[in-house]
Amino acid sequence: DIVLTQSPASLAVSLGQRATISCRASKSVSTSGYSYMHWYQQKPGQPPKLLIYLASNLESGVPARFSGSGSGTDFTLNIHPVEEEDAATYYCQHSRELPLTFGAGTKLELK
């Protein structure tokens, strides 16, 4: 199985600042020009919401302050500027092969 390691486990960011979340895969999730890494946001009592697919593509309806980058084994989610509604837990997930796996999550809090 591909193991996804997220860092940090939690972070506190002031309104208007940048939040950066990293995800490292135990082996490459990129092939044939695509990186099969995705980012989700989850708030308490709600299902995960897809933010970014294929490493850098913004899901429809997601604000442009969310962006994703990376390839191979190293990926990043950036949120800038952070808004109050962004307080949530963020997960990376790969779809390179079965089983699909998720990172352990990063909890974003506002200062």
UniProtKB/Swiss-Prot annotation:
Gene3D superfamilies in alphabetical order: Immunoglobulins
Chain residue ranges for the region called Complementarity-determining-2: 54-60
Gene Ontology biological process: adaptive immune response; immune response
Region of interest (Complementarity-determining-3), ranges: 93-101
Span list, region Framework-3: 61-92
CDD domains assigned to the protein according to its UniProt record, in alphabetical order: IgV_L_kappa (cd04980)
Pfam families: V-set
Sorted UniProt keywords: Adaptive immunity, Disulfide bond, Immunity, Immunoglobulin
GO CC terms, sorted: immunoglobulin complex
Annotated segments matching region Complementarity-determining-1: 24-38
Record region (Framework-2): 39-53
Regions crossing the membrane: none
S-S pairs: 23-92
Region (Framework-4): 102-111
Residue span of region Framework-1: 1-23
UniProt-listed InterPro entries: Ig-like_dom, Ig-like_dom_sf, Ig-like_fold, Ig_sub, Ig_V-set, IgV_Light_Chain
PANTHER family xrefs: IMMUNOGLOBULIN LIGHT CHAIN
UniProt name for this protein: Ig kappa chain V-III region PC 7175
Organism: Mus musculus (Mouse)
Lineage: Eukaryota, Metazoa, Chordata, Craniata, Vertebrata
